[in-house]
Amino acid sequence: MLGLIGKKVGMTQIFQKNGIVIPVTVIEFQPNYIIGKKTVDRDGYSALIAGSVDLKGSKVSKPIKGQYKSLKDIEPKKYVIELKGLDGYDAGDEIKVDVFKSVKYVDVTGTTKGKGFQGAMKRHNFSGGPSSHGSKFHRHLGGTGQATTPARTFKGTKMAGRMGGNKQTIQNLEVVLIDEENRAILVKGAVPGAKGSFVVVKKSKK
């Protein structure tokens, strides 16, 4: 499956000829290289391993260096993904942004913005308690326990806690523009993560 590792630059808007405004997210791509292959005989399935963004020298361990010995002029990469069903590439080849030329829709995976410790109303969209009439709770989640049996709170109950910082995929985002010169694409709508965060862009599954 077609895919690239990119960086979310931010959002802007594009005006169509009829005056309609389209909100778009700009995703910029640093060079993506094929750094390895997985085969059916050795791994049980076939796939390409792609990497992007050079890893700082101080963070490169000996095992990682060993993986790149056979690759000429390619530094160890910080972000690595697997691409299944993508043929015609060998180790050391670069995947360029023009692979999305024939793609109309993409799925974008990123890490959502971290919100820290949040209450149940913000985290789970609970209604909270009454706002007036002598209520002693307003933004609480209500009861979490059970009756005499089982006399405990079940694991996984929705409560206050750490919010955000999760892996999330937005599907079927329309590709509005491909800028080969600046190695970027513009997709309609928002994608997960803050400005400058890295995302994985793949051809839409649906």
Curated annotation (Swiss-Prot):
Residues 127-151 are annotated as: Disordered. The keyword RNA-binding applies. SUPFAM superfamilies: Translation proteins (SSF50447). The keyword rRNA processing does not apply. GO terms for biological process: translation. PROSITE patterns: RIBOSOMAL_L3. Belongs to the universal ribosomal protein uL3 family. This is Large ribosomal subunit protein uL3. It comes from Borrelia garinii subsp. bavariensis (strain ATCC BAA-2496 / DSM 23469 / PBi) (Borreliella bavariensis).
